[in-house]
Structure formats: C-alpha cells, structure tokens
A protein has these predicted regions:
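Iron-associated oxidoreductase/ferritin-like identity signal
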Residues: 2-10, 14, 18-217
C-alpha cells in the first residue's frame, strides 16, 4: 500500500503513482536479469559470431557430408568393377569427409551457435571410365578448397580469430587432399593401361587404412 508523500508546511503533493511505477520498473529489471542469468547457467553464454561466418560454417557441414556421399559413390563404382583397392581408398575418403562434417558441427556447438542440418544432394557424377572418377575427385577437392578459403576470408574480414584458428587445420588438410588426388591421377596415367601394373596399384590402395583427424575440439 502506498501513501502520499508530503513535506510539513508545504502544499501536499501526491507521488503515489510515480513511486509505484518506479517500484514496478525495478521488479521487471530484476526479473529480466534473473532470467538472463538462468539462461546462461542452463544453456551457456552464447558467443558473438558474425551472421555470414555462422551461415558459411553451417553450410559446410552439408558440403562435407555431400563429399562423403560422393566418395561412397566412387567406392561403389570401383567395387562393381572388381577393384577393391580403389574402392577401399575412396571408402576411407568418405570416412574422412564425414569426420570433417562432424568437426564443423562440433565447433559450432562448442561456440553455442545454432546448427541447422540441411538435406544432402544425391551425387550424380558423369563416369564413363576409371580416370573420370579420379579427375572428378580432384575437381571436387579443389571446389572444397574454395569453400574453406571463402569461410576463412569471411572470418578474417570480421576479425574472428577463433574461427580462423579452427580453419587453419582445414587449409592444410585441403592442400594434402589435392596432392593425394593429383598423385592418384599420375599413377593411373602411368599404370592404368597395363593390367599387371593396374593390379599392383590396386593392391597398394587396398593397404590404405583409416586414420582419425588430428584436429581435436
């Protein structure tokens, strides 16, 4: 209950309304602050991330999963041709791309950013011979390199050093991926037309084993 506030010997002035508004405002502010603190405790403090950088990182999850699908398609092609070594090489490529997708996924979650999973397109490469697969693989890696560079550039523009540090690993990784794809093309050009040499190359690729990514989040 509120009472009029006045000073002895002076004309009475009623501050009841102003006093109540002030008290109500304080209550609202306290409740708002409490709610914000509750959200921080429950969900964690949300880091500030540029909208463009966030969008590109989220899209890259989809791109990496598509890469895994594409390499599974390549593995399936070589399996159907009886070249299990080539099939193994591309199966491991698919596993690596899946790992890359999860690294982007985990990074966004660790920054308390929203992750939106998009539908994955069906791979539809034009393949008429073994070399088509290898060249398509190189072209795709060059495409992914461009995507990584684009995200890095966007992060640099807004001085998002944390994201730049995260992407450093992928910049190096893409250089290695392009080198591997080029090397495989060179070997196929040298040995692909000779059945005995192709058999030996297939055996070499069959020896490849999966290695988990060195980047740990």
């Amino acid at each position: 209950e509120f009472y009029p506030i006045h000073t002895k010997g002076k004309r009475k002035r009623n501050f009841t309304g102003l006093t109540q508004v002030k008290n109500d405002g304080i209550r609202i502010l306290v409740i708002a602050l409490f709610y914000e603190q509750f959200k921080i405790i429950k969900y964690g403090r949300k880091s500030i991330m540029d909208k463009t950088v966030h969008k590109l990182l989220n899209q890259q999850i989809n791109k990496e999963f598509y890469s895994a699908y594409l390499y599974l398609e390549f593995s399936n092609y070589f399996k159907s041709k009886g070249l299990d070594g080539f099939a193994n090489w591309y199966m491991i490529q698919a596993q690596e791309e899946r790992d890359h997708a999860m690294l982007f996924y985990t990074y966004l979650q660790n920054q308390n950013q929203t992750v939106t999973l998009e539908s994955i397109d069906k791979p539809d490469p034009s393949i008429s011979c073994h070399m088509d697969v290898l060249k398509a693989g190189l072209t795709h890696e060059e495409y992914v390199t461009g995507l990584i560079n684009n995200i890095y550039s966007a992060a640099y523009d807004v001085k998002d050093f944390r994201t730049m540090q995260f992407l450093d690993w992928f910049v190096k990784e893409q250089g290695e991926e392009e080198t591997k794809a080029n090397d495989l093309i060179s070997k196929m050009e040298l040995f692909g037309t000779d059945p005995k040499s192709l058999y030996m190359l297939n055996q070499e690729l069959a020896a490849r084993v999966y290695t988990a990514p060195s980047l740990v989040l």
